Structure formats: C-alpha cells, structure tokens
UniProtKB/Swiss-Prot annotation:
Annotated phenotype, changing residue 213 to Q: The affinity and the catalytic efficiency are comparable to the wild-type
Annotated catalytic residues: 90 (electrophile), 159 (proton acceptor)
Pathway: Carbohydrate biosynthesis; gluconeogenesis; Carbohydrate degradation; glycolysis; D-glyceraldehyde 3-phosphate from glycerone phosphate: step 1/1
Keyword Isomerase: yes
Gene Ontology MF annotations: triose-phosphate isomerase activity
Primary location: cytoplasm
Domain of life, source organism: Bacteria
UniProt-listed NCBIfam families: PRK00042.3-2, PRK00042.3-3
Reaction catalysed by this enzyme: D-glyceraldehyde 3-phosphate = dihydroxyacetone phosphate
Name of the protein this chain belongs to: Triosephosphate isomerase
Function statement: Involved in the gluconeogenesis. Catalyzes stereospecifically the conversion of dihydroxyacetone phosphate (DHAP) to D-glyceraldehyde-3-phosphate (G3P).
Amino acid sequence: MTKIAMANFKSAMPIFKSHAYLKELEKTLKPQHFDRVFVFPDFFGLLPNSFLHFTLGVQNAYPRDCGAFTGEITSKHLEELKIHTLLIGHSERRTLLKESPSFLKEKFDFFKSKNFKIVYCIGEELTTREKGFKAVKEFLSEQLENIDLNYPNLVVAYEPIWAIGTKKSASLEDIYLTHGFLKQILNQKTPLLYGGSVNTQNAKEILGIDSVDGLLIGSASWELENFKTIISFL
C-alpha cells in the first residue's frame, strides 16, 4: 500500500503563515503526491481547494448541510471550498470538547453519505495501556464499533493519547503489535496511519513497519521543511 503523510496544524498556525505554507507546498510537490500528502489547517487557514499536488482537508465539521449552528462549519461551506476530506474522532475533540461516541457516529454517517474521505482517529490513554495489551485491544475495538469499517473512503489513524504532544512516541514494538491487531479488524484496503510525537528523527523507522501505511503528524509538520523531510521518506 502507498504510504501517506498527513499534517494536522491544530490551532497553532498563524493564518498568513498557513496560507503561505500551502502555496509553497504546492510548488514543492508533484502530481503523484496528490493522494499521498494531506494538510489539515484550522478554519481560518483554509483556502479554496485548487491544489493539484496535495489534498486539503478540515479538522472538524458539523454534520449538517447548513443552518442555525453558531460557530460551526458545515458541508455546504466545504463544498464551496471544494474540500471533501476531514478528521473525525481526534482525541483532543473527544477529551477537551467532549465529543461522545454517539456524536462521532452521527458525524461519520453524515459525511459518509456525502462521500467524504474520513480520517477516523482512535487511541487509548496511558491508564489503559498500563493495564496490558488485552485492555488496549478491547478499548480500540470499542472505538471502532459504531462506524462502517468497509466504507471505501475510510482512513484510520491510531494515535495513543499518551504519546500526543509529549515528544515521546510509542515504541516500535508497541506500534507493530497494535497496528498488527488493528489490521485484523480493518478492511484490507483501509489505510492505517500512526500518529503521536512523530518527527523527522523517527518517521522513517515508523514508516518501515509494514502495517503502518502512513503518518498523522502534529507539531513536527508545522515547519514546512520538516514536513518535506518526512514526505521524502514515503
């Protein structure tokens, strides 16, 4: 399976830096990168999606066409921008913004009906990991229960919460074992990404694991040169 690199800007990128980054990345890449490189700016960092060398996505959207949903972005907004890719289930939205499994299912089903590419994020907390691998398997299985695992536009990103933003990635052995388990659950055509303190020093090794189909990268992608280095490992 072709390896993938996804950059999640979160809410960290200044607006004009984000715009400049997208334009410079477009100049750097080639058409064959379009379905291998993805960038998820915040809402203010978005531009109309005329890019030909990478795919532009959003970090979040509300599961309605449009309407009285103060502060939200909906599918009509995304259609105007020609954006058809989004993240669902990121741990920061689950924990900080209290998005429940039922609401994540509602999001998934809505954007599935619109044929969006959905990057569905899962991952356990350290307390679960410390209980042993059986507990991890049960937890991750539950996170995947409510979505259609045969949806052809699905990408799954495994991001152990205890590794996100900590500068301490999961060990290669942990990634190997967890991805091996998840591959048994997922459709064989569904890409499975790893995220969690990925950087230019560990990205190549992680990508060398057969069951890792790509990376979802946070802060290490916020500088264009770092992201370009990681892309070169694909």
